[in-house]
Amino acid sequence: TGGGKTMCMIEDVKRQFKSPVSKTIVVVAPRILLANQLCSEFLEQNLDGNYNVGVDVIHVHSGETHFYSTTKSDNIKKWYHNSTKHIIMFTTYHSLHKIQDTLDVEVDTIYFDESHNAVQKNFIEAVEYYSIYASRCYFFTATPKHSLTPFKVGMNDADIFGQVICNVPAPKLVKQGYILPPKVVINKIDLPDDDRFAYEHDRDCVLDTIDAQDVDKILICARSTKQIINLVTHSTFVVDLISRGYSWMMITSKTGAVIDGKKVDREEFFNTLNSWGKDSSKRFVVLHHSILSEGINVKGLEAAMFLRNMDYITISQTIGRVIRKGDESKTFGLLCVPVYD
């Protein structure tokens, strides 16, 4: 959400890497795209005081990266024992157990980013393991998930998640100028009729909103991958966007990343997304289902448009994509909500 959670981790890593004894840091993210983004943001900083010459990096997930990447416990163990430097491991909640399975990796500090994901039953075993056995363990989220029953894990379980060290309300971040206030706009649309395909109605809904709000950089949250594919392949949506001066990109776990009709790897997608976000003259639309909701930092993103229902955490995370500060002309994050007239 732009509150500075990542910088808290980075500054702590800098303090850890001042030690003459090699330290092992693990950074956990909910998605591969965010793990790669965190790696980029960490290594932009001078972590070890020697421009990261004394730092080894490994990714433990199935995604693409320039760094050594593996999900095999034996390979992790071999790489770990061959390193004589400070170590940072970037992984996902899905793959964290792969590090746990090595048994040899002694974790000095572990950071759980978007840690509301940690309470999921298929992740909690590995999370609890490192809560006990890592020397230092920290959880970061803008949307904590609590439980009122002892039969379901929540972040209010102090035995696993500890006590709250710092809690900064969003209004305080807005007041102090770290993030922008959100602005909700209701866009009334006609009820769909049986004479037209659903994707034609979706096209009109999106284009009417774009025309009405006149924003340059828009995130569209679709109901499903199928809705996105139908919109860009079966309707005139892409042609209509181009005629308005917009580029387009989409990313889902099923289709991968696409920029202006060309399939690209996730790293190129992420780099292009940030490059376009920084370019004040660039107009573009990003379509996704949920992959960009959590933690992804896109500079300059002005508006989010909802085409589906969401739980409060996903809504809050999506709002966080557009309330980050941009240039001086951006004074709020726009949230476009279509409703039937």
Question: Where are the regions that the model predicts?
Answer:
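Conserved RecA-like P-loop NTPase helicase motor core
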Residues: N117, S253-D341
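Conserved Walker A/P-loop ATP-binding site and its immediately adjacent core
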Residues: C8, V21-N46, R223-K226
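Conserved helix/coil segment N-terminal to the catalytic DExD/H
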Residues: S69-T109, I291
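Conserved helix-turn-beta segment of the N-terminal RecA-like "Helicase ATP-binding" lobe
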Residues: L33-T70
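Conserved interdomain linker/interface between the two RecA-like ATPase lobes of SF2 helicase motors
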Residues: G162-I229, H234
